[in-house]
Amino acid sequence: MKVTFCVRGVLSPLLANLYLHSLDVALTEAGHKVVRYADDFVILCRSQQEAEAALMRVQAWVVANGLALHPEKTHTGDCREPGHGFEFLGYRFECGRRSVRKKSLAALKDVIRHKTRRTRGDSLKRIIEDLNPILRGWFGYFKHALPWTFRLLDGFIRRRLRSLLRKQQKRPGFGRCHADHLRWPNAFFAEQGLFSVYEAYVLARQSR
């Protein structure tokens, strides 16, 4: 079981850490396991009864300190059950699995679309130089997610680049046909130095 909270209001991470420290202490002393970043936190519980008790304890503390809980982000549930997962710090936790939150993945894809827009006149080398730091940083944070995310993301990036190359060569279409895959195979982009999030995941797993 878990209880997910978000304190309503604008608090800087430093201010939130100072202000909410006493809540951390109170919950820990009550036997609860708390994971918190700024004003966003999760309490891990062993039963529904324990989760409800934790919620009541937090509600009492928040009211006593002149704060309020975010109504849409405060809830209890069994994250071991399908459909009852929760999102925290860009990840989604459900049924014992960690996946990238849909909103986080969509935000990255928007950046990639902008960097690989078909009207961009830069060389493939320059575009890859722009992409790689973004992909490395994103992977560094989300490397604990499920591997299929990285496979699909690699495919999305290569399709975007094939479409751009087709446009630069004044070929019709969007670079999604089998002929384009043969003309610019996955190995071609690896040779150009494109960072592969899936290959990075495989290497990270091997180094454990």
Regions found by a protein language model. Give the residues of each.
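Non-catalytic terminal/accessory segments
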Residues: 1-208
